[in-house]
Amino acid sequence: MGQKVHPNGIRLGIVKPWNSTWYANTKEFADNLDSDFKVRKYLTKELEKASVSRIVIERPAKSIRVTIHTARPGIVIGKKGEDVEKLRKVVADIAGVPAQINIAEVRKPELDAKLVADSITSQLERRVMFRRAMKRAVQNAMRLGAKGIKVEVSGRLGGAEIARTEWYREGRVPLHTLRADIDYNTSEAHTTYGVIGVKVWIFKGEILGGMAAVEQPEKPSAQPKKQQRKGRK
């Protein structure tokens, strides 16, 4: 039986950046890794309803910088920035160094695999039919410009006695093409019948130029030159 390699793991350093970007010596490495895990666990639990896509952690010069990618930045920031300040203090206590928290807005949540998987999960927990939830996610992604999407759910679908797996796919999802920008993520729906697993693959196009093209900051659009007005004769 054929097995699939993790689509994100195989593309790290080719077209996918790491979620933790820091260097440490042998003594500090384990402590940093442990605090990264605890910070992510705390933020994921605290921001459960804030549609968090991913959490990126950097460690510049004895401090920690956390970037939260979310589709609902208002919930993370809170009234007058109170909530984000509370998060900053807790993260600083966990990491043991000064903390800085940045918020990055996810403009198109329909094209983010984690947010799509969480959306399907919440619908399944509200007893929406799994086929309807899957088809809606596929249609929304294709409408907003995805080159391809595959959605898979597995478990006691519809309360069936025997667990099974069902999936929908539209467009192309080339898992073997390393330069393909494929966003993959999973989620779990805890229903009265048991746990239903959700997997989402979204193909957004091919990245030519490798990591240099991914990390290159967007250049500001050149302003059109003002046309000189001709003098009247």
Swiss-Prot record:
One GO term describing the cellular component: cytosolic small ribosomal subunit
An example molecular function term from Gene Ontology annotations: structural constituent of ribosome
Domain KH type-2: 39-107
PROSITE patterns: KH_TYPE_2 (PS50823), RIBOSOMAL_S3 (PS00548)
The entry's keywords: Ribonucleoprotein, Ribosomal protein, RNA-binding, rRNA-binding
Gene3D superfamilies from the UniProt entry: 3.30.300.20, Ribosomal protein S3, C-terminal domain
InterPro entries xref list: KH_dom, KH_dom-like_a/b, KH_dom_type_2, KH_sf_prok-type, Ribosomal_S3_C_sf, Ribosomal_uS3_bac-typ, Ribosomal_uS3_C, Ribosomal_uS3_CS
Region (Disordered): 214-233
Gene Ontology annotations of biological process type: translation
Keyword flag Ubl conjugation: no
Its biological purpose: Binds the lower part of the 30S subunit head. Binds mRNA in the 70S ribosome, positioning it for translation.
HAMAP family from the UniProt entry: Ribosomal_uS3_B
Assembly behavior: Part of the 30S ribosomal subunit. Forms a tight complex with proteins S10 and S14.
Family according to the record: Belongs to the universal ribosomal protein uS3 family.
Protein name stated in the entry: Small ribosomal subunit protein uS3
Organism of this sequence: Pectobacterium atrosepticum (strain SCRI 1043 / ATCC BAA-672)
